[in-house]
């Protein structure tokens, strides 16, 4: 049985701080240090506040006036552009954006959107004949260059270069573009322009395919006669000339088909009388000037 004055195990431990000075000093040192009043910052590190003036009505009105002036200027420019577009449309002028070839646009060419659907196939074949002429003249330059290297002389090479430089842009400007515009606008005068220069194109292709010995023994063109003449001395160059002869023959056949189809369309649409009327009106206008 426990005694009356036995200690209670659940009582808190009573410590006398005066009984041991060292323990009292440690207790004093364990108290938290007071906060430094200089370090207290109630702005959370954002610095002092800056007073912003609330009277911005003058600046707002100025900005509003500037916006209104810019809007009026844009409206004026839009009206001016619209007037120019209407004037161009009344004059019948079509603004053409260069879009071909895609990697370096130099001409406007859009058969799908500008040529009537029943004429697109014919226009595409005419376009292929233009590309065929480019191929023929390019191969002609290659073949004549080979002949020049083998000792045929530099004059035929210069002639081949002249054929290419004059033939490609000349064909586009003189007969392909007039046909394109004739199909697009149904102009009889454009058809007449096409027929005149396309016949010259066919004549040149026939001359090149034959290559008669008229100018510098005919070796500036890869025709059949020049191919026969060259193949006896230089077999490889002769093969080049025979390939060029085949290209010119194919170009001639395609061109004959194109002009036949265009002429059938021209006659079927009654463009002969219309072309005569347009020519007469043009001559009358030139006389009155």
Swiss-Prot record:
Cystine bridges: none
Gene Ontology cellular-component terms listed: plasma membrane; recycling endosome membrane; trans-Golgi network membrane; transport vesicle membrane
Induction description: Up-regulated in early interactions with pathogenic fingi and down-regulated at late stages of mycorrhiza.
Domain of life assignment: Eukaryota
Cytoplasmic face of the membrane: 1-123, 260-289
Location relative to the cell: Cell membrane; Cytoplasmic vesicle, Secretory vesicle membrane
A Pfam family annotated for this UniProt entry: SCAMP
Region listing for Disordered, in residue ranges: 1-65
Transmembrane spans: 124-144, 156-176, 191-211, 239-259
Gene Ontology biological process terms from the UniProt entry: protein transport
Entries under InterPro entries matching the protein: SCAMP
Its membrane topology: Multi-pass membrane protein
Ranges in coiled-coil conformation: 59-98
Primary location recorded for the protein, binned into one broad class: membrane
Keyword line: Cell membrane, Coiled coil, Cytoplasmic vesicle, Membrane, Transmembrane, Transmembrane helix, Transport
Stated role: Probably involved in membrane trafficking.
Family affiliation: Belongs to the SCAMP family.
Protein name (Swiss-Prot/TrEMBL): Secretory carrier-associated membrane protein
Organism: Pisum sativum (Garden pea)
Gene encoding the protein: PSAM2
